[in-house]
């Protein structure tokens, strides 16, 4: 299915929050894509790095508001904000600042000879 309404798609409660695994439903496998729905005060810890996997990650806030920490940098992100963590060794985390915060998380390890996505835009 190439279309998902996140507000109607079920979440799965984990030790790391309420997640929506999106790869299988969307039929994509070249990168990881999931969404998390979270509220302030939830006991979730998203602090991690990707040293073991080499992944680059990007986060897109689609609802609510969140604070991201990427290395030593802090970002206040509202809907439409994209935050990236291209350095696998950088510690990254986020926390919701408003109820109903929803973040799409995308990650993949770079491959040698990978195309420069977006170059066609100019």
Task: Describe every region a protein language model picked out.
Residues 35, 70-72, 87, 96, ...:
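Residue-level recognition of conserved beta-strand positions in structured domain cores
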Residues 65-67, 74, 91, 100:
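Structural motif
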Residues 51-68:
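Short, conserved beta-strand element in jelly-roll/cupin
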């Amino acid at each position: 299915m190439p279309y998902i309404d996140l507000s109607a798609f079920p979440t799965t409660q984990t030790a790391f929050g309420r997640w929506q695994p999106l790869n299988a439903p969307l039929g994509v496998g070249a990168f990881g894509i999931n969404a998390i729905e979270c509220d302030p005060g939830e006991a979730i810890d998203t602090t991690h790095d990707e040293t073991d996997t080499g992944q680059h990650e990007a986060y897109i806030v689609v609802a609510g508001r969140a604070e991201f920490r990427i290395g030593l940098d802090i970002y206040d992100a509202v809907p439409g904000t994209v935050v990236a963590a291209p350095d696998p060794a950088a510690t990254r985390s986020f926390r919701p600042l408003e109820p109903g915060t929803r973040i799409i998380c995308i990650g993949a390890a770079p491959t040698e000879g990978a195309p420069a996505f977006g170059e066609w835009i100019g």
